[in-house]
Structure formats: C-alpha cells, structure tokens
Amino acid sequence: MRSKFEKFSLVLGGALIGILFTFNLPVFADKNNPNNLPIDKLRTFAEVFGKIKSDYVDQIGDPKLLDEALKGMLSGLDPHSVYLDKDKYKDLSQGTAGEFGGLGIEVGMKDGFVEVITPIEDTPAYNAGLKSGDLIIKLDDTLVKGLTLNDAVKLMRGKPGTSIDIRVLREDVVDPIDIKITRAQIKTKSVKAKLIEPDYAYLRVTQFQDRTGEDLAKAIKKLRKENKHAFNGIILDMRNNPGGLLTQAVSVSAAFLGDDELVVYTEGRAPDSKMRLTTAPENYIRPGGDFEKNNYIKSLPKDIKDVPMVVIINNGSASAAEIVTGALKDHKRATILGTRSFGKGSVQSILPMMNGSAIKLTTARYFTPNGTSIQGKGIEPDITVKDGTESLAYREEDIPDSLSNPQDKGKKDDKPVTNGPTPEQKEALKNFKPIKFGTDEDIQYVEALKILKGMGDQASMLKN
C-alpha cells in the first residue's frame, strides 16, 4: 500500500533552528486570468529595487536584496510561513532527525528581536531557565536589534563547552535578565518513559521527530515487560511539546486508538492539502521494506488501547501535540489535565526550491475528529491544574498577524484572557527555574497519578 510519506511531508512546529534552526518579470498579462501577476505591482517592485540599488546608503548585492524580498513575502502571510535559505533548511532537517549543535531552543523573530518559542527539555537553554516568550536582546557584546535571524543563530552556535552571555526581556519583569549558557552538542530524545510504580506508566513525548512513534512503541513494550502484566494507568505528558511531524502525531495517536479511527482532517486550497488521516498504518509507516513487519503499532499489546489514560498539556503544547490531544479527547480515550494548550491549528508544508533553499508555507488548517478548529483557542483540559507559571503563558493568540479561526466568522472576539502576575509573582519570576517534569515537585504529574488511581478504584468497585 502507498505510504502517506510519499504524499506529504508536513511540519507543524516552528522551525528548529540549529540551536535546537536571473530575475525575470513577465511583460504581459491576460486580463481573463486572475492568477496572472499584476503588472503595476511588478513595475513598482522593480522601481523600488532600482531605488535601493542606486540610493541606499550602503551598497547591497542583488542576491541579498532578493533573499530579503522573499523573506518579506513569506513573513507577511502569517507567523509560521518562512523562507529557508540553504543553511536554515539543513538545520530544519537536522532538527526533525533529533540531532543538532547549539543551545537547544526553538526561535523566531518578534519586533526585531530573537524570540524564544520553546526551550527544549534537558538542553543547556532549558536548564539555564530560558522561557517561552523571552526576547533575546543581546548575545555577548552584540545587540540583536538589526540582525537577521540567521545571523543571530550563527552567533549562538559554537564549540560545545564554550559559553555565551544572553540578555533577555521577560514579560512582566521590569529589568533585563542576564543568563550564561554553555553550548553543547544537542541530541534530543523525543520519548522518555518510566514505571512510576507497579502498574502505572509515565510516557513523555517532547517533540515529534521522524522516529517518535517507533520510539514510543519500544518504550511501551519495555515498560510492559518490566511490569509483567497490563498497566492500570498511563500518563502521556506532552507539556512544552512544540510539535513536529504530522505523520508521527498520527502514529502516537494510533498507539492508543482503535483501527481506522479518525485522528485529524485538514482543509486547504491545494488538492494535496485536503486530507483525512486515520490510524491506518499507511498514514505513518515509512515507504520501503516489509509493510506488515514495519507496523510497530500493531506489535503493541492489545490492552494498551483500553488502559485508562491522563494526558498532561500546558500552553507550550502546540500543533502536533494538540492533534494527539484533540484526537484522544474527541474519542473519549483520555482525560486531559493541565492548562489550555498553545492553539496552533495550521499545517505547514516544507517545499524545496531548485537552488537548495526551501519555503515553509502554511497550506492548510486542521480540525479535530469532532470538527473543531483550535486555531488561536487551544484545547481546554477536562481538569484544570495550574503549575504556578500561568502568568508567563504565551500562545498563538499572542503572536501578531496569526491566522484567524474559521469558526469565528461573524462572532465577536471572545479570546480567553490570561491574568497578569501579582507583585509577589513578578519577584518570584525573576529567579524562575523550570519544573522537572515527572517528579514529586511536579503538581500536574502528581494530580494525574491520583486521578488514574481513582479511575482504578472506581473500576474495582464496579466489578465487585
């Protein structure tokens, strides 16, 4: 059977930049064809190009001017559409493979500064206390304002073991924060697993790389063997998961849902952007080799699909993580606990160009099995458990020029409001250190385990 890998390669998180990340104009137009380029606008473009070439204070080469024009054309669409030069395209490929050099953060640009989208767990940036939404304003002695994202990324890269001084602005903290980070070779592990205690498994998915589904299946089988019999409960932790590959979101969903159950559907203008993705193996297995042999989800114990589950999410759970959460929630397969998710309901396609560059283009909106768009809204948990950092929450709705939610047409804006921190909280945030997930100090994790045990007690009472 033809694999969906041959049909699409979609990335739903921000680009994981390596800290994790002849011109001819047509001279005619057919008035009957609305898709032809507008001559007047092209003349204006050529005129502006000429003025920059002749009058700008510094001499700028044609390749740089045209590259910047391409960047502007993509960035003007929405926050997630970007032009990837050869270096950035290579960095993105390395990021989805799970290995890259640098600090371990997913970054973007905002107001001329480098914005921290997500610090990746167990990396130097994460351990140093960088937070989603932090704006990097200085790298060693270099001010970030005026740098391109690529230039800033190059400054942040370096030999493992060397350090860099970073100055950040943090929302609701008055003074800039100085952080020293030691660079490292980053090898991200997208799946972490442990037996919390007999009969209760903890599965943490930090992002969706090209082998996340396989790694999850291996982890489940290893824990199951260690436990010697079926689990009484599973915690699936996707907090601070920025997303990743759509195929792997389908794969993780398939581990816990029944055969051919709908995971997500997408709608866009291009024919290939209209898809209904179910848990069928052709939607996540790579092409080549023995199809049945490569079906790692089929090899899981059958009772995994019935074990009580709690999924933990927060404002850093985005895109692919929200697809999994939405599928498990809509099919009533799991109880969702934590805080409202990020709210990224769009799909980006990586489209390679002939010169070795690529564009990451928003090509579709996605919908949960029940037909809900979470764009700009996120997924509300069934049980809200805050971890004390909600005042730092940063979501899709906070990004300027983010896509609209198609289900909001004609409705007044009822965007959820995040309350700011109290003066005491502001002081505490200055010395904020990330919570170590999956430990006794993790309030949401502790509460999830209590809920699972409560489910087990109820099941026992019903049997007796």
Q: Which role does the model predict for each range below?
A:
Residues R2-S9, G18, V191-N464:
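C-terminal "post-core" interaction segments
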